[in-house]
Amino acid sequence: MRLFIDGDAFPNTLKPILFRSIQRLNLEVFVVSNKPVTIGKSKLIRYLIVEQGADEADNHIVELVEEGDLVITADIPLADRVISKAAHAIDHRGELYSVDNIKHYLAMRNLMEKIRESGEMTKGPKPFNQKDAHQFANQLNKFLAKNIIKI
């Protein structure tokens, strides 16, 4: 199992949590972004900077991801694409996306986008907080404990 990080929107507060997991479990990690992003220094981490563009990082992740890999992203359409390749996806708030729930999240995302575009609602998601970081850490550790054993 490899770990891919959609690096452009990855919260700084999660970097130490992620780095500890990478080191502890000896995971191969790819941080894919449109600009330089640093999680930490390690031989296990590869930083891949792609061209500027709306879906360049997403497309690169989808191209590289394989069955069983884990992608960390807040981008629901990207999560849908990697799940269709039998990979896994978790967001920054600890939500584990699966074949059972991704279509629901995608439909809700698309509905909210239409509502915002119509001007009826203008605010986006609530600010990232410590509770979110804690939920992410718990979900990541739970997922890794369950899936690293299979390797």
Swiss-Prot record:
Pfam families: DUF188 (PF02639). Belongs to the UPF0178 family. This is UPF0178 protein Suden_0449. It comes from Sulfurimonas denitrificans (strain ATCC 33889 / DSM 1251) (Thiomicrospira denitrificans (strain ATCC 33889 / DSM 1251)).
